[in-house]
Amino acid sequence: MKIIVTSIALALAIAARAADTTVTLTDVHICCPSCVKGVATAVADVKGLTAKADQDAGTVTLTAADTTTIQKGADALVAAGFFGKSSDAAIKVNAATGAKDKTVESMTVENLHLCCGKCVTAVNNVLGNVPGVTGNTAAKGAKSFEITGNFNDKDVFDAFQKAGLTGQEK
């Protein structure tokens, strides 16, 4: 009898593991090993979640027993300044930034992922294509930076998100 109960428990454990859900976020800005580490750090506190960042593909694969945990992982990545497209419509990548869709002369951006010089270059390239942006103070490791010019705040975040980055307007 003990063997049967143990066998059933083992079968249920295997079945539960096989039922894990996997969602891939694509088009995420992951330019270096520090970005890969940043992904791991961002989701470290999400219990039951496994995250795998692929620098070459620009993807983050999230695996957990349920979509609630995966959603927490996606939310943690956004809070850390990463952005991408979800392979599962049930997992929403929060695009809210606080931008008001208004023309501004300056704006402070917080929590955009800036771990290295390549991240700063990516920000500069994005902002160079936003009409009206004339300057910024983005720097490696910065928690916030200023953008100046005469530009639409929402256009800035739309461009960041298209490039796999995000942040919040302060």
Language-model segments: residues:
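Flexible metal-binding regulatory segments at protein termini and peripheral loops
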Residues: 2-6, 19-170
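Hydrophobic h-region of N-terminal signal peptides that target proteins for export
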Residues: 9-18
